[in-house]
UniProtKB/Swiss-Prot annotation:
Keywords: Acyltransferase, Cell inner membrane, Cell membrane, Membrane, Transferase, Transmembrane, Transmembrane helix. The active site is at E264 (proton acceptor), K330, C382 (nucleophile). One of its GO terms (molecular function) is N-acyltransferase activity. It is a multi-pass membrane protein. This is Apolipoprotein N-acyltransferase. PROSITE patterns: CN_HYDROLASE. It is an enzyme of class 2 (transferase). Catalyzes the phospholipid dependent N-acylation of the N-terminal cysteine of apolipoprotein, the last step in lipoprotein maturation. GO terms for cellular component: plasma membrane. Pathway: Protein modification; lipoprotein biosynthesis (N-acyl transfer). CDD domains: ALP_N-acyl_transferase. GO terms for biological process: lipoprotein biosynthetic process.
Amino acid sequence: MTKKSFFSLGRLLLAVPAGAIATLTFAPYNYWLLAPVSIALLLWLLQAQTVKRSGLIGFLWGLGLFGTGISWVHVSIDTFGGMPKIASVFLMSSLISYLALYPAAFGALFNRFNRGRPFHQLMLSGPVIWLLLDWVRGWALTGFPWLWMGYGQIDSPLASLAPILGVEGITLALVLISGALVASVVYRNWKPLMVPVLIMALTWAANTVSWVVPDPTKNLDVALIQGNVPQELKWLPSERWPTLMKYTDLTRENWDADIIVWPEAAIPALEAHLPTFLQNLDSAARNNNSTVITGVLDQKEDGQYFNNILTLGKNAYGPYQYDKATRYSKHHLLPFGEFVPFGDLLRPIAPLFNLPMSSFSRGDLVQPNLEASGYSIAPALCYEVAFSEQVRKNVNIDTDLLLTLSNDAWFGTSIGPFQHMEIAQMRALELGKPLIRSTNTGITAVVDHTGQIIKQIPQFETAVLRATITPTEGLTPYTTLGSWPLYFYSLWSLTLSMILIRRRSGRFRDTRPVETE
């Protein structure tokens, strides 16, 4: 093996661990400084490479990131999917490989344009290409915006950008910082370091601004019920009433709370099958001047299934009646859990796809806030909280707090529930609203408007979290503008990059020969 071949192979081998260390930036590890390290390593590995080899380097980096970062998905597929081991491994490998195509596309596009002009690559077109591909990943095939790099910065100084530009703005800042580091070190030019200096100055300035104002006059007491019902028992007919009685007993002990919250699909039956139980619960809550919010599945007369949130007791809707109840219906459904992409092709393959309720119908993208005990609540069911634009569109000037219900029992003791919690924290920070999160097995927690967890209870315990919530007044810039500032920045950056290409200009050029295959 020649020296050149050795170093070429070394780039490929280094790409996998370079991507894998990025997983450590996310919860539960929270080593947020590793994010710019991982991105900078990728950008360095892409220097002076052909388009084809750049795509391969990006793909291997993506295998490292997603192979470690979403390993928790396999827990659900393998434990509850009813698949042969080889089938579950194949499905998981396919998902990881699909997600790795996005870093592969980044690598290829990175060296497709502006080759020989590293400043353009690292500071203009590169960060925007990364951002655009993140948006595509969050949309294609219903979207999978998990492990956007900005999420791992919830505890870093860059977090102060979230109320202005959202998690995508934090990701952009990370790629710009990483690009500046590579440009300054590899090409021995200190001027790009002005970019991270300016970004950190912006984060400091943003941190001094109070975008929203807490309103203690609207404080409310909440009780979040964590039932800790084993997933393998949850839907057994013999466990229906024991589960309902568990939640009812825990609720009865907390009637002094303004709002009592049960997890996603806490009621292990279809709503239409339990009218008497729900009427009695509604009456008890109303008599105690409290509201119960619960997740419940429903099937309409036309056969459509919905994953809903229902409010009972003290609300603006009156006594519970099945035909007149106001519900929130989940819009963003979980692939393979709540609907099967390419169902006609995949359903015969494995029992996982033959679950009777694996084909849910969508609710509307924007729905009225839920009303509970006089408070206006913007809900998101489970996976939906990862879709920042959807959650943002459901927040308005009257919204008091955010609510997310989930059942992360599917993912056992993996890192998945921690990443899910971190995403919920980012939504609270972006929108400047406190957030309550009730789950079956954890993580059940309360988050303030700055994205910090103020109280939580341990996973895998039957428990009740009691906390006082302080709603906020006002709207953050991100709530008002969404991603439009980033759209305009992307357009400006790409336009400027093309203008500079046409002028054949640049602050400095990479005169090194491109490494051949």
